[in-house]
Structure formats: structure tokens, C-alpha cells
């Protein structure tokens, strides 16, 4: 009996020795990514799940927040709860001044595959994704300029075939459709989230009006007056409640109003997030003041990823960024209709027949990237808020414009005098080719 017990003890001890020699499963490094994009949520989630299943060392945790994105990030940094990676929808200078973000140039320069796929070293836009030699994010694609999305059935019911070329005709179209809707449907709808930017500001752009005078290096809002006057007429006949952007998208998809303005992300929104099934919808260029194109429509390099300095596992975070911008990931993203390609490498590899409604947002020959306007320490409302307040009748139009010219230029001059920024001047600036001029930075 004693021999049996001794043998059993010996076997158990041997088993314990063997088990203790087996290494414990290492805990995954969790990399948290904050995004303010919801239109691509399904694709991002599926690809993140694929990554997490294939990797036993890194796990990606995505959090989507669409409200107050930049402030939420800064608060999280201050509170010690910051994510590791964020989407690019922030003001770069603010994040750099806050010492919040990491220069990715060393990672990029050491990775030839990443350079090949993203063309990262040639997609540096001063003040937008890069400052000097530092690169803080690399665009995966580009968002088109604003288009007019429209309900074909409501237009046809009021006798219209498409979107007119002039702002005056556009206003009259909205008025007639609202009148014909008799309180059930409306000609146009505006969101409470940056409404000026989504239509009227871009109509001004293609009319040659921009808020920064690149040739003379100063702010000038004077050209917006006719667009504000037209805006008052549009608001008077619009759907009467300006709600958040997703609520207004849902109402457009339900047929509540006929005219909506936004960029190429709406291809995914109205296919996946709020699929339109009850009517046919069209996409058209924004009208200009007189029907002529006198300025470029702004496109936005996008879907970039910034690494926060608070990240404790920067090499792991870089692996996640590399995955998000890998060939497989980006080809699927573009074919899913979530964005437009920004590099020839990806453009040549996507099957454009799979892009769905994104094809309706193919770039126009007058779309371009604008040089980033210097970020200033402004007191009071920004120009988009104030100009919309003028449209809503909360301020006189002339007074609103005069106040903006005064406040913006005073703040600009002050920041330059203190050495915070330099004056941006492009003497050979061409509004139809805004990125083609020679940039000069002045100390006064």
C-alpha cells in the first residue's frame, strides 16, 4: 500500500513539474482606437475582429463617438483615460501644442511596405497632417467635396429634373417643393451640426469665395453676404427642426425633405446606416452663385490615424495603424464604398464595380486640397457658428461679417506678434488650383 501511495505522489509531482514548465498564456496588449466615423462601423468591426482572431499578442478595441470628439480626447488625456490611437478629425496644431500626438515619421521611414501602399512621404499637407518634417497622420483616402443629395421623386413631383447650376434657382426649387409638400414634406433640411459648412460654404467656394485671403495673408469674410441672404430664404422653407446629423440623415432617408448636402461619406450612410429603399436618390454638384465655377471645391484627405503620446505600447499601436492602412484593408474599404482612393497604388487594385454609390462622388476636375489656414487663438464664436447665427436672424449680416473680419485679423496679428504662428501668404494663389502656388511664411 505504501508503495502505491508513493508511486501516486511521484506521478502527481512529475505532472506538476511538467505543467509548471508550460509557459502561461501571455496577456494581449489592448490598443484602444477612438473614431468619430459611424458610416463604416460594420466594415471596421469585421476587420478588427479578423485581426483579433489572428493575433495572440495585440487586441484592438474600437470606440465610436460622434459628438465633441476633440474635446473628449483632451479631457481623456487630462484624466488619464486616453485611447492609444484616434481618428484624424482633430485640429492638428491644437494636438501638437498640447504635446498629445506622436511624430510617425520614424516609423514610416523604417517601413518600405507601408510607404509603398500609402505613399506616405508624398502626402504631407502642411498644417493638416504634417508640421515641418513631422508626420502625425497619413491619409488612407479622401472625402469628396460636398454634393447635393436629392430625392428624385419629390423633385419630379414639383416639376424638376435635377439640381440647377445657380444658387437663386436652387432657392426657388426649395421654396416650390416646400409649398407643394403642404406641411408633409419639405424642400430642404439642415442639421444642427455645422450646417453652414455642409451646403452654403461650399457653394461660396466654387464661386471663388473663401474665408482666407491667401494673396494678402489675412482673413476676409466679406464675400459670404449673398450666400447668407440666400441662406435666410432657405431656412424659411426648410424642415423646421435642425437636429443632429444622424437624425437629419434618417429623415432624408424617410423622404421628409428633398435636398440634403454632404460629402462622399453619404454613399455608405444611405447604403448601410440609413438605407434608402422608398425612393431613388441622386447626387449632384453644388450650385454656384452665377452658374460659373470660379474656385476649387475643397476635398479632404482623410481616414488617418494619430498615435497619442499617452500610449504605453507605441510599437503595438503602430502595428495597428499599419494594419488599418494595409493593402488588404484599404482595397476592401474602398470597394465597400466607404471612401475614395488617394493613391494610384490602391486605385489600380480596387474593383470599381463594387464601389456602389461611391462612384457618384468621383472627383470633379475642380476639386482640390486647400492649404491649411493657420490656427489662431480666437475669442468668441468661430466663423461658421456666427455666419449661421446671421442666417437664423440672430445677428445682422453686415454686422456679423464686420465682426468676424475684426476679431479674426486681430487674433491673427496678435498670435504672429507673440511668435505663436507665422503669416501665410501665397502671392501667386489661384482659386481654381489652391495648392499650386508658392507658400511663404512671414514673421509679421
Protein language model features and the residues they cover:
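Short, well-ordered beta-strand elements
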Residues: 27-38, 58-63, 85, 136, ...
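Extracytoplasmic "Venus flytrap"/periplasmic binding protein-like
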Residues: 50-120, 153-165, 251, 256-259, ...
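Hinge/lid segment of periplasmic solute-binding proteins
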Residues: 90-145, 282-286, 441-444
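Long, aromatic- and glycine/proline-rich binding clefts that accommodate carbohydrate-like moieties
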Residues: 120-121, 281-288, 334-391, 421-444
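Extracytoplasmic/periplasmic solute-binding protein
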Residues: 129-141, 146, 168-217, 257
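C-terminal capping/gating helix-and-loop segments adjacent to ligand/active sites or protein-protein/ligand interfaces
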Residues: 130, 139, 299, 359-414
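Glycine-centered hinge/linker elements that transmit conformational signals in sensory
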Residues: 173-176, 213-242, 286-289
Amino acid at each position: 500500500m505504501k508503495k502505491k501511495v508513493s508511486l501516486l505522489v511521484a506521478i502527481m509531482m512529475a505532472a506538476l513539474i511538467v505543467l509548471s514548465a508550460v509557459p502561461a498564456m501571455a496577456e494581449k496588449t489592448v490598443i484602444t482606437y477612438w473614431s468619430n466615423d459611424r458610416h463604416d462601423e460594420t466594415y471596421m468591426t469585421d476587420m478588427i475582429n479578423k485581426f483579433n482572431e489572428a493575433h495572440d499578442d495585440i487586441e484592438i478595441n474600437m470606440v465610436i463617438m460622434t459628438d465633441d470628439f476633440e474635446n473628449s480626447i483632451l479631457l481623456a488625456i487630462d484624466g488619464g483615460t486616453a485611447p492609444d490611437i484616434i481618428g484624424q478629425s482633430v485640429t492638428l496644431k491644437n494636438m501638437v501644442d498640447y504635446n498629445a500626438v506622436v511624430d510617425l515619421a520614424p516609423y514610416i521611414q523604417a517601413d518600405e511596405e507601408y510607404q509603398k501602399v500609402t505613399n506616405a512621404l508624398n502626402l504631407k499637407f502642411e498644417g493638416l497632417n504634417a508640421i515641418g518634417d513631422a508626420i502625425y497622420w497619413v491619409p488612407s483616402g479622401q472625402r469628396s467635396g460636398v454634393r447635393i443629395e436629392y430625392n428624385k421623386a419629390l423633385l419630379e413631383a414639383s416639376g424638376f429634373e435635377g439640381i440647377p447650376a445657380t444658387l437663386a434657382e436652387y432657392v426657388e426649387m426649395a421654396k416650390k417643393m416646400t409649398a407643394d409638400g403642404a406641411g408633409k414634406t419639405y424642400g430642404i433640411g439642415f442639421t444642427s451640426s455645422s450646417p453652414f459648412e455642409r451646403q452654403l460654404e461650399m457653394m461660396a467656394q466654387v464661386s471663388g469665395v473663401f474665408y482666407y485671403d491667401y494673396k494678402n495673408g489675412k482673413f476676409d469674410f466679406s464675400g459670404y453676404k449673398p450666400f447668407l441672404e440666400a441662406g435666410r430664404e432657405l431656412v424659411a422653407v426648410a424642415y423646421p427642426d435642425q437636429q443632429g446629423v444622424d437624425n437629419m440623415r434618417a429623415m432624408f432617408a424617410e423622404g421628409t425633405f428633398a435636398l440634403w448636402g454632404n460629402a462622399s461619406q453619404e454613399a455608405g450612410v444611405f447604403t448601410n446606416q440609413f438605407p434608402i429603399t422608398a425612393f431613388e436618390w441622386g447626387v449632384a454638384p453644388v450650385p454656384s452663385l452665377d452658374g460659373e465655377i470660379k474656385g476649387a471645391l475643397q476635398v479632404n484627405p482623410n481616414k488617418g490615424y494619430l498615435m497619442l503620446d499617452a500610449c504605453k505600447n507605441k510599437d503595438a499601436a503602430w502595428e495597428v495603424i499599419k494594419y488599418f492602412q494595409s493593402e488588404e484593408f484599404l482595397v476592401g474599404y474602398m470597394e465597400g464604398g466607404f471612401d475614395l482612393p488617394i493613391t494610384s497604388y490602391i486605385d489600380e487594385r480596387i474593383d470599381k464595380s463594387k464601389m456602389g454609390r461611391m462612384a457618384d462622388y468621383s472627383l470633379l476636375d475642380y476639386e482640390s486640397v486647400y492649404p491649411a489656414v493657420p490656427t489662431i487663438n480666437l475669442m468668441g464664436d468661430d466663423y461658421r457658428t456666427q455666419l449661421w447665427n446671421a442666417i437664423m436672424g440672430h445677428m445682422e449680416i453686415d454686422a456679423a461679417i464686420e465682426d468676424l473680419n475684426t476679431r479674426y485679423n486681430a487674433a491673427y496679428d496678435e498670435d504672429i506678434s507673440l511668435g505663436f504662428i507665422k503669416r501665410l501668404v501665397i502671392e501667386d494663389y489661384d482659386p481654381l488650383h489652391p495648392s499650386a502656388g508658392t507658400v511663404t511664411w512671414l514673421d509679421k
